[in-house]
């Protein structure tokens, strides 16, 4: 594969420069596009690792459940300053939040503070179930994790909030016996 550019009379560095220029243009277009026409009901913010790089990613959720990539920022952590900057960029590009948004985040205090302070009173925050499940089970012995994950998932699938809450609260005594930190 590394010999392919030479077959066409191109140097590897020339191909690399052209690739960087083309992708930089597409990235700039993505990061600067207007968000005004998006009718969103939800906003997912999460930090992700890509090799040695860390990114905070923003996805919008439409009324019909479609996820729309909105933007991202390279950052070492999900700290409040970085996340507020990302949210402000989304607002500057036309993110409509005045009708209210559901923000789905992990347990990061930086993300929570950034969302609640940036969208002042127009946001309801929900903890991501996947992150919560992972955090709880990380305190348990390997042999206990799958069973507790299943019980938590079964609770999340209940048809009403009250039923789900009751099932999750019923796990508390069991988790307390396994490891108090899991509660």
Feature map (PLM): residue ranges:
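Proteins with a high burden of low-complexity, intrinsically disordered sequence enriched in S/T/G/P/A and R
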Residues: 1-10, 175-183
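RNase H-like nuclease fold core
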Residues: 2-105, 109, 113-121
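Extended amphipathic alpha-helical interaction segments
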Residues: 113, 117-183
